[in-house]
């Protein structure tokens, strides 16, 4: 995500390195590079020009303190303007209705149905909501089935009427059902099309008018670049939606949609989809995204993800075992499962300042965990609890059973031993008390 743009911007700032002061000439040269980087990232031309004009005005209007290098000042100004470009403040959902109603809109293939499931799961687990998903796509039985399957996976009820061809009435009936059965949130998934057409827009306009939703969200595939921006403009003219959801932001996207949409439609990005898993959804924070674009990482989001997986009782149990030097392969396996829940490894690593650039061309394979899991699952319960008994014969058996090599088994045992020693050191220090404090 944004790897190429980050690299290009870093190269642009190097023009100012070694300069004693900011001048019209070196600012113009730097911003020419910045504008080209933005355009190559598929940012809207007017947005890119307006952005660099603002940065130029602010850069030339400031006196550089002797302690601040011109290149550092430029990074600061660009960071602030990128944050403003993407909305400035984090945009929250406003859900005041009883039940609160969220209407989903967007083209077919944008990830609208999957996002509906992700959002239902997020609001259920984080906000203690009781959601009802509503299938209003009367044209594609597969879409109704997809929502039903998602509902089963996240344990959320799905309302559908297989014999009805009236999406407006289905939505109204669903809200009536929600009131009767105590649901406090209704998420309405509507039909999409491969392209905008009058029938589609009339239909979703009618649904919105009938149900008067608290929030209307426009879901768009970020990989479609400027097409995403143009589609957002047309939907906004008809629906006057409240916010944008960018899906597939983890893919090979140049980032143009994320940097253009806020300015073009004057509506905030509220959420981003960052993977296929049902927990791969993040609230959109403009300042944090600016950090990541400029290669500064995103430690806050990384800590938040860790906190979501943090189990205080499990941590206390583990801490006692580590203190007694009883950390075993069952605990090791449990830690791997927690890390996997946080997201894919490359994305997590990119949130650490300075690491994103270093790993850009490195293939970090999430399947690496699979061989570790296979080795541990090939151990007997006694071997997992007492790794010290793993002699040569046992290691050979484990390698055969897991489809790995003796070398891989030995490597894992060495890593496990190092992990156990490191954890014992951490538990005995103040770091062992950090996560509970963060939780508070």
Report the location of each language-model feature.
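Residue-level recognition of specific faces of alpha-helices
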Residues: 1, 15-18, 37, 47, ...
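Long amphipathic alpha-helical segments used for membrane anchoring, targeting, substrate engagement
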Residues: 2-19, 288-440
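Primarily NTPase-proximal linker/entry elements flanking Walker-type ATP/GTP-binding cores
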Residues: 8-136, 143-164, 171-190
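Residue-level signature of catalytic and energy-coupling elements of molecular machines
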Residues: 16, 42, 78, 107, ...
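Amphipathic alpha-helical interaction segments
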Residues: 29, 33, 50, 54, ...
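Short, small-residue-enriched loops and turns at beta-alpha junctions
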Residues: 109-110, 139-141, 165-167, 192-196, ...
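Conserved phosphate-handling catalytic cores of large alpha/beta enzymes
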Residues: 171-175, 183, 195, 199-209, ...
């Amino acid at each position: 995500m944004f790897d190429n743009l980050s690299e290009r911007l870093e190269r642009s700032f190097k023009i100012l390195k070694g300069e004693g002061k900011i001048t019209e000439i070196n600012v113009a040269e730097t911003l020419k590079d910045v504008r080209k980087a933005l355009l190559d990232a598929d940012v809207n031309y007017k947005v890119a020009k307006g952005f660099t004009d603002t940065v130029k005005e602010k850069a030339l209007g400031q006196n550089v303190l002797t302690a601040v290098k011109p290149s550092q000042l430029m990074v600061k100004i660009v960071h602030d303007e990128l944050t403003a470009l993407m909305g400035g403040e984090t945009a929250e959902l406003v859900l005041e209705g009883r039940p609160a109603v969220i209407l989903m809109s967007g083209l077919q293939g944008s990830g609208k149905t999957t996002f509906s499931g992700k959002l239902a799961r997020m609001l259920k687990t984080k906000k203690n909501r009781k959601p009802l998903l509503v299938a209003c796509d009367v044209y594609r039985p597969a879409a109704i089935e997809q929502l039903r399957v998602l509902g089963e996976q996240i344990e959320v009820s799905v309302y559908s009427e297989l014999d009805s061809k009236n999406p407006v009435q289905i939505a109204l009936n669903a809200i009536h059902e929600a009131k009767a059965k105590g649901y406090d949130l209704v998420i309405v998934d509507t039909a999409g099309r491969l392209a905008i057409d009058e029938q589609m827009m009339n239909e979703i306009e009618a649904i919105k008018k009938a149900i008067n939703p608290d929030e209307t969200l426009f879901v768009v595939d970020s990989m479609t670049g400027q097409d995403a921006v143009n589609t957002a403009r047309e939907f906004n003219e008809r629906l006057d939606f409240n916010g944008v959801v960018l899906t597939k932001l983890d893919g090979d996207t140049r980032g143009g949609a994320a940097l253009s949409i806020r300015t073009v439609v004057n509506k905030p990005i509220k959420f981003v989809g960052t993977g296929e898993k049902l927990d791969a959804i993040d609230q959109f924070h403009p300042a944090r995204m600016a950090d990541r674009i400029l290669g500064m990482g995103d430690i806050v989001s990384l800590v938040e993800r860790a906190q979501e997986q943090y189990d205080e009782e499990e941590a206390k149990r583990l801490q006692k075992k580590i203190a007694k030097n009883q950390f075993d392969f069952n605990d090791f396996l449990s830690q791997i499962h927690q890390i996997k829940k946080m997201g894919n490894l490359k994305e997590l690593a990119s949130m650490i300042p300075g690491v994103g650039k270093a790993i850009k061309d490195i293939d970090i394979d999430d399947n690496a965990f699979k061989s570790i899991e296979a080795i541990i699952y090939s151990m007997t319960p006694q071997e997992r609890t007492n790794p010290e008994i793993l002699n040569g014969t046992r290691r050979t058996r484990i390698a055969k059973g897991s489809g790995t090599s003796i070398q891989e088994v030995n490597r894992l045992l060495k890593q496990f031993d190092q992990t156990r020693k490191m954890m014992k050191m951490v538990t005995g220090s103040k770091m062992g008390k950090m996560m509970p404090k963060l939780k508070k």
